[in-house]
Amino acid sequence: MTTMLLLLVVAALANGQLTILPHEESQICFLQPDNPGFDFDGNFTNIFRDYASVKISSFTYKAQDADIVEILNVDRDRSCTILAIYIADSTLDFNTFLQSENECVKYAASKKHYIKLPRDREYFALAKNLSFCPLNDDLIGIYCDTQLETTYFSVARSSNYDVTDIPEFTELGYVFHSNDHFYICERKSEGNWIDYQLFYQNDAPLGTVSQRVNWGNVWSNVKTVAQMVYKILDIFFGKRNIEPRA
């Protein structure tokens, strides 16, 4: 988070000491699809920077063939005081990745990957057209041939990246295959790792592997990016007390 040159001076009159604390600038981050949206340049951002010491940053993500892990795996999100995401495609499951701590490993396309998934942990895949072959105690495929990916069982079959739970029923592991890169993720714990608000152009999804959805930061039927911008500013500055309607 950027530290401004402006310093707050706090005087402790009782003992005559003087403490100087740095004034930290808040940052509101907006993430929107790469198709034309809201113009964040110019006087609009200057208003809040000059008047309220708030930095407004805008970023875009690839709307087609969107990889949510790749979108969120950017250092910018860690410096945001609050992150607002505009989602035109409701199939993009941002909730799953923002509402819990997940550890994801990326695997290359068009290769067979042997992966062990302990049964006492919870795993899910972010993939499209992913298949797998579970192994028995002799490391032989269970009703599938590890050498022939055409005999594998389908985990995900979609033209977009989807979140799918993986049944952890064998200790010996699985062989995975996909023609596209994919992720195997372990859910480590429940809880937001960033203060965020989701704005869906249409109806909001429930979240594929989330145990529960925090409807307090999910908004639906937000037709324009501009509506998101003014709503998140309203939330940030606390001018009104209006509950989201998901």
Curated annotation (Swiss-Prot):
Keyword terms: Calcium, Capsid protein, Disulfide bond, Glycoprotein, Host endoplasmic reticulum, Host-virus interaction, Metal-binding, Outer capsid protein, Signal, T=13 icosahedral capsid protein, Virion
Location in the cell: Virion; Host endoplasmic reticulum lumen
GO cellular component: host cell endoplasmic reticulum lumen; membrane; T=13 icosahedral viral capsid; viral outer capsid
Signal peptide start and end residues: 1-16
An example molecular function term from Gene Ontology annotations: metal ion binding
Function as written in the Swiss-Prot or TrEMBL entry: Calcium-binding protein that interacts with rotavirus cell receptors once the initial attachment by VP4 has been achieved. Rotavirus attachment and entry into the host cell probably involves multiple sequential contacts between the outer capsid proteins VP4 and VP7, and the cell receptors. Following entry into the host cell, low intracellular or intravesicular Ca(2+) concentration probably causes the calcium-stabilized VP7 trimers to dissociate from the virion. This step is probably necessary for the membrane-disrupting entry step and the release of VP4, which is locked onto the virion by VP7.
Family, as annotated: Belongs to the rotavirus VP7 family.
Assembly and binders: Homotrimer; disulfide-linked. 2 Ca(2+) ions bound at each subunit interface in the trimer hold the trimer together. Interacts with the intermediate capsid protein VP6. Interacts with the outer capsid protein VP5*.
Name of this chain's protein: Outer capsid glycoprotein VP7
